[in-house]
């Protein structure tokens, strides 16, 4: 009877369950979307109970549709949308408020207030993060401040906090395991990434009682077992956890110092493994934990691109220039160049290394000869220029020149983007055979803990290259194109409309 690892990939818009065999191949996928809540402009929330039921349903569907018995599952790995925050009553098991999603800006005032009091550097020094609504700490404070009776309950030890991984493990284990892993803890603004402990000073600044917080564990160990009635009569070890971007890094077998992966999703996320050294960034990158394994912690530098694949969605849904995303490859390839057109997709500001929340999208270099093909090509190229921006910041901070870039996410299917990416960063771009690297990373972490795979070398050997894109552009052309991009970004930042 063949054995498997089941990976739960709990994302921002859907929950998925994916089955992996010993070879790291996908044997089945089930997916369910859930509702997004937008109570006020800039706020994004989820119903944590709906997330839980969506996870239960995709697991059941996955096993049923693939005729798999629960006793064929050796372990469960969990990867999750990071930073999204749940606070629940440990006695009733019910959340006291919606989950506040990583995208939500409702805690901006808390962040501004802490900055005005001069605490930004304190948070940065201990957590490697910016004082921004993106991260979990201010979300917890907001819930305690705004839900009647919550603060008193928290101080009495009746409330629990967790990122989505914690919430799912607590539910799957029958309320016995209140834990998280290093990668998720490192995204909370409450965890000291050097001491590897919840930080008392930061908790005091946020006014969050320590007893609410989960125990922090490695990314690969047995945290507990499923209770039989949640998993079809079986007690299966829950054995691997990582936030989505760190899971993708692990799934890409980026185990060595200097290994880099870039995910082209709605936004873009680049992570560089910096080994056992936490590199402090001077270039607008985040310092975070890559994974905790075998008693050691590996750190990472992370860069965020706010608009990546969503720029292609905009061509389709906003401008109606295309009917489907794959068409962009054909259009972009019909012309030799953009003829000097640059598109800066700063629809929600600019991320790394600019961190300019007020910048807005812009198009430069239009002429009477500009056609749809030039416009589409400029949009695709913008993904690659932004990636170079982040890569240069990483090389500067780490002192490591990136030799090759491993890629995943929806846009990697586009050969034009991949080739232009290789050209503009002047390094090879490696597209793997299995592109579900986030779920695969969580599966690998769980599989290592239960002995399904032997060690990192065993995993490294299973990473398979589908296509390698090598740079073909000469240095003069590369320099000219990238210089034009930098001018376009600068002009975008200068243009500001008054309220």
Swiss-Prot record:
InterPro entries named among the record's database cross-references: ATPase_NBD, Carb_kinase_FGGY, Carb_kinase_FGGY_CS, FGGY_C, FGGY_N, Glycerol_kin
Record-listed sn-glycerol 3-phosphate binding positions: 12, 82-83, 134, 244
EC number assigned by the record: 2.7.1.30
Entry superkingdom: Bacteria
Keywords: ATP-binding, Glycerol metabolism, Kinase, Nucleotide-binding, Phosphoprotein, Transferase
Residues the record lists as Phosphohistidine modifications: 230
Coiled coil (residue ranges): none
Entry's Gene Ontology cellular component terms: cytosol
CDD domains in alphabetical order: FGGY_EcGK_like (cd07786)
Pathway stated in the Swiss-Prot or TrEMBL entry: Polyol metabolism; glycerol degradation via glycerol kinase pathway; sn-glycerol 3-phosphate from glycerol: step 1/1
Changes after translation: The phosphoenolpyruvate-dependent sugar phosphotransferase system (PTS), including enzyme I, and histidine-containing protein (HPr) are required for the phosphorylation, which leads to the activation of the enzyme.
Residues noted as binding ATP in the record, renumbered to the chain: 12-14, 266, 309, 313, 410
Membrane-spanning intervals of the chain: none
UniProt-annotated binding residues for glycerol: 82-83, 134, 244-245
Molecular-function GO terms, alphabetical: ATP binding; glycerol kinase activity
GO biological process: glycerol catabolic process; glycerol metabolic process; glycerol-3-phosphate metabolic process
PROSITE patterns registered for this protein in UniProt: FGGY_KINASES_2
Pfam families, alphabetized: FGGY_C, FGGY_N
Activity modulation comment: Activated by phosphorylation and inhibited by fructose 1,6-bisphosphate (FBP).
Reaction equations catalysed: glycerol + ATP = sn-glycerol 3-phosphate + ADP + H(+)
Subunit relationships: Homotetramer and homodimer (in equilibrium).
Similarity comment: Belongs to the FGGY kinase family.
PANTHER family assigned to the protein according to its UniProt record, in alphabetical order: GLYCEROL KINASE (PTHR10196:SF69), SUGAR KINASE (PTHR10196)
Full protein name: Glycerol kinase
Species, as recorded: Staphylococcus epidermidis (strain ATCC 35984 / DSM 28319 / BCRC 17069 / CCUG 31568 / BM 3577 / RP62A)
């Amino acid at each position: 009877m063949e054995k498997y690892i089941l990976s739960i990939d709990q994302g921002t818009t859907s929950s998925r369950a994916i089955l992996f065999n010993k070879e790291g191949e996908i044997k089945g996928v089930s997916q369910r979307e859930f509702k997004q809540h937008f109570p006020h402009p800039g706020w994004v929330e989820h119903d944590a109970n709906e997330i839980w039921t969506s996870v239960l349903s995709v697991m059941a569907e996955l096993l049923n549709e693939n005729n798999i018995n629960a006793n064929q599952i050796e372990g469960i790995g969990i990867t999750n949308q990071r930073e999204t925050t749940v606070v629940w009553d440990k006695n009733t098991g019910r959340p006291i408020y919606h989950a506040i999603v990583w995208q939500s800006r409702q805690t901006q005032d808390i962040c501004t207030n802490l900055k005005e009091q001069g605490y930004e550097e304190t948070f940065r020094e201990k957590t490697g993060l910016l004082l921004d609504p993106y991260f979990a700490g201010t979300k917890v404070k907001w819930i305690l401040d705004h839900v009647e009776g919550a603060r008193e309950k928290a101080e009495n030890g009746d409330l629990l906090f967790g990122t989505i991984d914690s919430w799912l493990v607590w539910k799957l284990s029958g309320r016995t395991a209140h834990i998280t892993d290093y990668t998720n803890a490192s995204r909370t603004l409450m965890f000291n990434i050097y001491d590897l402990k919840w930080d008392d000073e930061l908790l005091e600044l946020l006014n969050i009682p320590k007893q609410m917080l989960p125990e922090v564990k490695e990314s690969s160990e047995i945290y507990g077992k499923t209770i039989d009635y949640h998993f079809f009569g079986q007690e299966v070890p829950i054995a691997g956890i990582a936030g989505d971007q760190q899971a993708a890094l692990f799934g890409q077998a980026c185990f060595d110092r200097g290994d880099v992966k870039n995910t082209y999703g709605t936004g873009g996320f680049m992570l560089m493994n910096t080994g056992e050294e936490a590199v402090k960034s001077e270039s607008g990158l985040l310092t975070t934990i890559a994974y905790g394994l075998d008693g050691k912690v590996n750190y990472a530098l992370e860069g965020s691109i706010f608009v990546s694949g969503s720029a292609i969605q905009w061509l389709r849904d906003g401008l109606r220039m295309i009917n489907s995303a794959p068409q962009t490859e054909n259009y972009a390839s019909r012309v030799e160049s953009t003829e000097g057109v640059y598109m800066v997709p700063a629809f929600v500001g600019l991320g790394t290394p600019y961190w300019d929340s007020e910048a807005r999208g812009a198009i430069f270099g239009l002429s009477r000869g500009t056609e749809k093909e030039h416009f589409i090509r400029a949009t695709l190229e913008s993904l690659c220029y932004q990636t170079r921006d982040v890569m240069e910041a990483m090389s500067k901070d780490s002192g490591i020149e990136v030799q090759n870039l491993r890629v995943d996410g929806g846009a990697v299917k586009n050969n034009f983007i991949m080739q232009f990416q290789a050209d503009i960063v002047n390094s090879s771009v490696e597209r793997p055979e299995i592109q579900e690297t986030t779920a695969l990373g969580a599966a690998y972490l769980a599989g290592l803990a239960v002995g399904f795979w032997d060690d990192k070398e065993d995993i490294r050997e299973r990473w398979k290259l589908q296509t390698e894109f090598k740079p073909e552009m000469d240095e003069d052309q590369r320099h000219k194109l990238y210089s034009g991009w930098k001018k376009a970004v600068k002009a975008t930042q200068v243009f500001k409309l008054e309220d």
